[in-house]
Amino acid sequence: NFILVGPQNGLYKPANMYGQGTPIVRIDGFKSGDIIDNKEFKRLSLEESDIEKYKLNKFDLVINRVNSPEYIGKTALIRNLEESTVFESNMMRFAVDTSKLDTYYLLFFLKQQFVLNQIANKRKDAVNQSSINQQDVKSLIINVPPIELQITFSNFFQKLEKNRNLFNQQALNFDNLFKALQNQAFNGTL
């Protein structure tokens, strides 16, 4: 077992606690395979003890534990958070032994059909929602190549992610420029 911390269920607070205070990662705040850096998260008022208990750390992974069946197992990697940030109750967080299992490799692997099939077989279905528990996460079979190969893959994955983000930004800039030119052309100001 490569898990050092957790899996730990997240924090539940009623809606009237939201609005200001500590940032909280919610299940609607990421897509499967996301790397979570600083974002605009919702905030809620918490006691310091809750912040300490549910605080996300660099290289933690969060996994969706309660949702509609197609979203069970949605996973993200915590990378750089500038302030203490917690996570909500319908997800779990865990940390792995990074001397044996690279977190970027694991993030990629957890999105593969092999793992998603395991999660589908373990989930408990109820009316309009499904769930997995800590033991289900601990029992996932993970293919673990030597750490050197994982790191090589991780470096490639991170470069690919950086290039993808750059491409997406350039595509957005192109779209904005095209819309501006189109607007000028139709207004006769070109």
Residue ranges: model-predicted function:
Residues 1-9, 139, 143-151, 158-184, ...:
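Non-catalytic DNA-recognition/assembly elements of restriction-modification systems
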Residues 83-92, 101-104, 119, 123-151:
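A short glycine-rich beta-alpha junction/loop motif
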Residues 30-33, 69, 116:
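Active-site/binding-pocket entry motifs
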Residues 26-27, 51-111, 131-133:
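A short beta-sheet element
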